[in-house]
Amino acid sequence: MNAFDPVKIGIVSVSDRASSGVYADKGLPALQDWLSRTLKNPIEFMPRLIPDEQAVISATLVELVDAGCSLVLTTGGTGPALRDVTPEATLAVAHKEMPGFGEQMRQISLQFVPTAILSRQTAVIRDQSLILNLPGQPKAIAETLEGLPARGVPGIFAAVPYCIDLIGGPYLETDDAVCKAFRPKSALRAMPE
């Protein structure tokens, strides 16, 4: 038995070509692998592979939040191309916008490629769920979540557990070797035996 709170996590890959079978999706496996290595909590994943259609993306996000996902991560559809509408779909279902997540993702990605400035990742809260738009490439997903520890650049996931605490979700515990979560001392729980 796991002493940590169980958590439902929605993982959504947004891609016209992958959702129509033109090529294999790499986003969902990358997200599931990273989260499984990072979180000590028992996780129920709710994966979705969908096209770049704003109404479909918004409906999928609402469905996952309504199903009890405390965290929903999307990958893909955040660039400037005409079909890239993930941020618009996400903002359309938001109760609160959390712009710091997108700002930090761009800062991390700019360490590697100057075109990261074209990225439009965002984050929002809907009910008691945090929704994060991540980059489309598996390498960039890991970099933005973990940060660049050797350069002293924190990843966005360090703030995710405390954000979820603040909106009434489960207490997420991370493996510090992958990503050390930050919480104020007043928000820390004793470690389960």
Task: Label every model-predicted segment.
Residues 1-193:
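Non-catalytic beta/alpha edge segments that cap or flank active sites
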